[in-house]
């Protein structure tokens, strides 16, 4: 088994991981039965990892969300769907590789799947622009969502981006307009939409495919108006205060659930989704199937009205009203 990169706060596990690897190597090189010793060390490592991950700070959760081995949109699509056909292009000369989409089947139901896609290494990250979509990417997503709306396909989106690409060319090509049009049109769609934050959900880049009837996020994912580094640079002119900004921004699942921004926080395997991708895929599949079945019971008008009220309730503050009460108004 290839060794996974350990995060800074996992360093107390380094010695245990080294011992486990040495025992595995010994087992490969000889016929000595080391399974009892190996089981004991693996159990100890799992227990210590569970203790560490139960008390992560927001800044540490960001590290987990950005882990290079964390499952990506394509990884989840392959786990969710037996059949998957990727669709390309925005029909305006662009086929952004940072935002992908296509048709697949969740169980026996045809669905549209779209999402940000990061790379596994430097070369792939450059090709995918580190998951930062250009205007062409958001226009491609809109074209595919229009297709889904026309043919009655539920839309499943997967959010994993530090933000929309903010380069000069992206601004010249209308980045703000592309995202704004997506927001407007997603409110009008007559089909169920479920968005899931699988890694980091940053700013307008996340919102561009994030207007949904149900917004889910994994336990160690983050969803934020701006990255903590950017926030610290803007407020304090010091990116070194990113950890302080992360706590103030309320970017974690429990905080966002209490604020009414997300609808469900999905548990992760001990150590994060990168430690057990298949288990993470099963958790996601169950949540998507369950939420989709509920949404399919609603009429088109009820879907759109509920979606509108959900987002109108965000950002309002009244002493005597909870987010649930605001949505009921």
UniProtKB/Swiss-Prot annotation:
Single GO molecular function: carboxyl- or carbamoyltransferase activity
Known EC number: 2.1.3.15
GO biological process, one term: malonyl-CoA biosynthetic process
Entry's localization field: Cytoplasm
CoA carboxyltransferase C-terminal domain mapped to chain residues: 40-294
Presence of the UniProt keyword Nucleotide-binding in the record: yes
Assembly description: Acetyl-CoA carboxylase is a heterohexamer composed of biotin carboxyl carrier protein (AccB), biotin carboxylase (AccC) and two subunits each of ACCase subunit alpha (AccA) and ACCase subunit beta (AccD).
Enzyme class: transferase
Family: Belongs to the AccA family.
Keyword annotations: ATP-binding, Cytoplasm, Fatty acid biosynthesis, Fatty acid metabolism, Lipid biosynthesis, Lipid metabolism, Nucleotide-binding, Transferase
Name of the protein this chain belongs to: Acetyl-coenzyme A carboxylase carboxyl transferase subunit alpha
Function as written in the Swiss-Prot or TrEMBL entry: Component of the acetyl coenzyme A carboxylase (ACC) complex. First, biotin carboxylase catalyzes the carboxylation of biotin on its carrier protein (BCCP) and then the CO(2) group is transferred by the carboxyltransferase to acetyl-CoA to form malonyl-CoA.
PROSITE patterns noted in UniProt: COA_CT_CTER (PS50989)
Main location: cytoplasm
InterPro entries noted in UniProt: Acetyl_CoA_COase_a_su, ClpP/crotonase-like_dom_sf, COA_CT_C
Matches recorded under SUPFAM superfamilies: ClpP/crotonase
GO cellular component: acetyl-CoA carboxylase complex
Catalytic activity from the UniProt record: N(6)-carboxybiotinyl-L-lysyl-[protein] + acetyl-CoA = N(6)-biotinyl-L-lysyl-[protein] + malonyl-CoA
Organism: Synechococcus sp. (strain WH7803)
Highest taxon in the source lineage: Bacteria
């Amino acid at each position: 088994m290839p060794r996974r990169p350990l995060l800074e706060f996992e360093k107390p596990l380094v010695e245990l991981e080294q011992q486990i690897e040495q025992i595995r190597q010994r087992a490969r090189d000889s016929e000595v039965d080391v399974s009892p010793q190996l089981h004991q060390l693996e159990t100890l490592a799992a227990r210590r990892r569970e203790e560490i991950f139960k008390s992560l700070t927001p800044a540490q959760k960001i590290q987990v969300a950005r882990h290079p081995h964390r499952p990506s949109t394509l990884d989840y699509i392959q786990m969710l769907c037996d059949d998957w056909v990727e669709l390309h292009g925005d029909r305006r000369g662009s086929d952004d590789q940072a935002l992908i989409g296509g048709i697949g089947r969740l169980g026996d139901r045809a669905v549209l799947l779209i999402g940000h896609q990061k790379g596994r290494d430097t070369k792939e990250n450059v090709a995918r622009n580190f998951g930062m979509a250009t205007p062409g990417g958001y226009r491609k997503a809109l074209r595919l969502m229009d297709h889904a709306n026309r043919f009655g396909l539920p839309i499943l989106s997967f959010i994993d981006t530090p933000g929309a690409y903010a380069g000069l060319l992206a601004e010249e090509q209308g980045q703000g307009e592309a995202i704004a049009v997506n927001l407007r049109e997603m409110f009008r769609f007559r089909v169920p939409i479920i968005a899931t934050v699988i890694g980091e959900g940053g700013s307008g880049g996340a919102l561009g495919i994030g207007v949904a009837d149900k917004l889910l996020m994994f336990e160690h994912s983050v969803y934020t108006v701006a990255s903590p580094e950017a926030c610290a640079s803007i407020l304090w002119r010091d990116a070194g205060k990113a950890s302080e900004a992360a706590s103030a921004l309320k970017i974690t699942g429990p905080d966002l659930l209490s604020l009414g921004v997300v609808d469900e926080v999905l548990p992760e395997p001990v150590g994060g989704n990168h430690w057990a991708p298949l288990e993470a895929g099963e958790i996601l599949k169950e949540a998507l199937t369950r939420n989709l079945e509920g949404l399919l019971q609603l009429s088109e008008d009820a879907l759109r009205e509920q979606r509108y009220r959900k987002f109108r309730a965000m950002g309002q503050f009244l002493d005597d009203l909870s987010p649930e009460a605001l949505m009921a108004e």
